[in-house]
């Protein structure tokens, strides 16, 4: 079984480049979470809470 370090050396990729690439990939995951996932989740929670309040007030009117 080929170890990761042997695979990186066989591909002529320096450890610095591989580390930088890995760091940038993880940083992009965090950026995506901040820019897309968290606002979308907040919006969905807001809408579901608002809908719940509207349904509650609608049942009180009956």
Curated annotation (Swiss-Prot):
Keyword presence, Membrane: yes
Membrane topology: Single-pass membrane protein
Domain of life: Bacteria
Main location: membrane
Membrane spanning stretches: 26-46
Cellular-component GO terms for this entry: photosystem II; plasma membrane-derived thylakoid membrane
Entry's Gene Ontology BP terms: photosynthesis
Keywords: Membrane, Photosynthesis, Photosystem II, Thylakoid, Transmembrane, Transmembrane helix
InterPro entries (alphabetical): PSII_PsbX (IPR009518), PSII_PsbX_type_2_subfam (IPR023428)
Pfam families assigned to the protein according to its UniProt record, in alphabetical order: PsbX
Cell location: Cellular thylakoid membrane
The family this protein is said to belong to: Belongs to the PsbX family. Type 2 subfamily.
Its biological purpose: Involved in the binding and/or turnover of quinones at the Q(B) site of Photosystem II.
Subunit (UniProt): PSII consists of a core antenna complex that captures photons, and an electron transfer chain that converts photonic excitation into a charge separation. PSII forms dimeric complexes.
Protein name: Photosystem II reaction center X protein
């Amino acid at each position: 079984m080929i170890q990761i370090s042997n695979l990186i050396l066989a591909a002529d990729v320096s450890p610095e480049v591989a580390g930088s690439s890995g760091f940038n990939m993880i940083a992009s995951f965090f950026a995506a979470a901040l820019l897309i996932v968290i606002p979308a989740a907040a919006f969905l929670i807001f809408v579901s809470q608002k809908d719940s309040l509207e349904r509650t007030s609608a049942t009180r009117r009956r």
